Amino acid sequence: MDPQNRNKARPNLPKDEIEALNELIKLQKNKVITIKPCDKGAGIIILDFEAYITSCNNHLKSEQLQPDGSRKPFYSKVDLPTLDTAKTKILSLLQEALQNGYISKDEFQAMDPSEKTPGRFYELFKVHKQHEPGETPPERPIISGSGFITENISLFVEHYIKKVSTKHPSFLQDTPDFLRNIEEINSQGPLPENSILVSIDVSALYTNIPQDEGLNIVESALDDISLPFPKEFLTSLLELTLKYNIFEFNSELFLQLIGTAMGIRPAPSYADLFMAKIDKLAQDLASQFGEGIHPIRMWKRFLDDIFIIWTGSLDNLHNFLEDLNKIHPTIKFTMNHTKNENENICNCAPCPAIPFLDTSASIQDNKITLDLYRKPTDRCQYLLTSSCHPAHVTENIPFSLAYRIVRICSVPETREKPR
């Protein structure tokens, strides 16, 4: 704003950029292009509108390979009566809960689905993932639960299952929690020679969690916390959230048949509880590859990203991953590690680094060293000093960035290098 006239707005973009922006908005309005935020890195991606619709339709037609060799669709087209049936079932369960004193009148009114609408399907694109020039990057499907019939019951469910989803030993809350775990490992003394840092990614976790299996795991986990109502009431709400995930795309209604959507509130906690079981199975499996001792010094997981310190051989690590991909019919893993395939396993030279969260981890002198990691596609979008934001906001940006570097980088060499 002009300080001489607070009622007069002054654009902070050059004229040619404003004209280009207006042209893009016009093209999007006319359905020539679509503009979407990137999955990560704060950038945007501009796609041909028809190419975007085709990508979404292809995903909605995708199928999951079953253990018997058959294929089952992830989604199915439905009609409006299915939406009405979902509302009726939710309302019936809530009325019964109100009569039994499980919920208050205010909670009943807040969760009433009568005026709610279907969810909304869209895709975000993983420009940070490898893809050929000119090709559409891999997509991440999102079903927005905002305003949806299960929105408020899912909030209610999340309030309770989040309390138990953080209790398993492999749980990582965020980067500071990861830093604390690494500091603890380093305080225990040098790592064994030829230790390997490993990052494991779960492929399409949310859409591959079997609904009935996930519900059983949640119901069992709820025994570990105190609830003001029977746990069956909470799992019934979760079941309705999972099995009536109805959404709209391109003027058609769909029902998700397999897995859960990233856009619903309990999805991260639900996935965490499911993966806690997989964590235990995986670590039990790893004991077979330890040559007398358990080869995993550390196993920590942030949702679908797993960090491991492996003290066994490289061959056994690959054998472990091969068997890991057999422990569950729908959950599959990919791996990255700090040992170059062409490097002699006895070579004690510093290993390459692997990214995990927003850190880059390597081993130096048998200790874990951390550096700041940014994806190559990160746009580093920060406020300009000419922005109309309060001065303390813009002044705090360089301090926050410097503090992040100091907090993550574990040695002076990584803190002081140019970025």
Language model regions located:
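Charged structural interfaces that engage phosphate-rich ligands
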Residues: 1-419
